[in-house]
Amino acid sequence: MAAEIHSRPQSSRPVLLSKIEGHQDAVTAALLIPKEDGVITASEDRTIRVWLKRDSGQYWPSIYHTMASPCSAMAYHHDSRRIFVGQDNGAVMEFHVSEDFNKMNFIKTYPAHQNRVTAIIFSLATEWVISTGHDKCVSWMCTRSGNMLGRHFFSSWASCLQYDFDTQYAFVGDYSGQITLLKLEQSTCSVITTLKGHEGSIACLWWDPIQRLLFSGASDNSVIMWDIGGRKGRTLLLQGHHDRVQALCYLQLTRQLVSCSSDGGIAVWNMDVSREEAPQWLESDSCQKCEQPFFWNIKQMWDTKTLGLRQHHCRKCGQAVCGKCSSKRSSYPVMGFEFQVRVCDSCYDSIKDEDRTSLATFHEGKHNISHMSMDVARGLMVTCGTDRVVKIWDMTPVVGCSLATGFSPH
């Protein structure tokens, strides 16, 4: 079922501790059980499984429960030991797990959506289960009565969800690339604002309530940090992945952001440095360096008897430039560009060697990651994906051992 991996500790990369195999289809969610050597998984094969580590070092399923429909999302509340499972048919089911994690009792079914559930969050304070789905809505239901309290519709599939428990603000990402901030009430909600910055569908969100930072990952392979608490509209772009960003986790104590992409890439971003905002791209009818006309500027082309050029943009200054004036490439990590991007010649000359020093580390998960979660207190990470494999990682060599007071590495 599961193999214990004996990796030689390396100071620079995550250490693979265990590999769990046995699912018959893609694993859509995997969550580490706090203070236990255990993992809860949900899969397209219609099963919920609780895996516990045995004396042999291997993980074996102590609970194996088959659902009526493929499992598409999951939330686990450890203090009350409640599991909420979203399904492909739109229903959310609640279970209660025994103290020894060997038995799981069905509590109730919530008719939350008309289509596939994409994300679930449980709020104990309000006794709400909040969820998003492919029926283009976010819904919140009362866990005491099982009744629908409210619902808000979007123009496209709602793909991911984060929630601020103190203010009852919900952040919903959708397939159009937009993030909507909602204030949820007992039976109504109000739209506070919408955030637009990605060029692809939003795949994941992470909310840090302490610094009031929202992180979003999308199919445009990029991560954006939205400084909600700063109230100045500040955003930071992070580009280092080569595929869709599927999962995020911000480590507040060490000011690091962990992101995973569908090609197996794992990135750890240093957010404890002074980063610069990427500029807005400027528009012009001619190159802002050599003043040659762009191809749609017919008048200047006629007047100067020259051929029009393609418009490009310098990633550092944002100016509209021609290919000749932006022939060089450079990384510029302080602005989030971890690999080489187009810059104009004058900006290239202004970038020093030390400016190219990476502010992130990149690692290989070696499987298609669709979901990731972390036990920050122990420095553990679990990844799962379309290859039906669940991997448990020791992240302390990468993020450090000081994540929690009294924590010591394995």
Swiss-Prot record:
Zn(2+) 1 binds at C287, C290, C322, C325. A zinc finger (FYVE-type) spans 281-352. The keyword Repeat applies. Coiled coil: none annotated. It is found in: Early endosome. Keywords: Endosome, Metal-binding, Phosphoprotein, Repeat, WD repeat, Zinc, Zinc-finger. CDD domains: FYVE_WDFY1. The modification Phosphoserine is found at S408. InterPro entries: G-protein_beta_WD-40_rep, WD40/YVTN_repeat-like_dom_sf, WD40_repeat_CS, WD40_repeat_dom_sf, WD40_rpt, WDFY1/WDFY2, WDFY1_FYVE, Znf_FYVE. This is WD repeat and FYVE domain-containing protein 1. It comes from Bos taurus. The lineage of its organism: Eukaryota, Metazoa, Chordata, Craniata, Vertebrata. The gene is WDFY1.
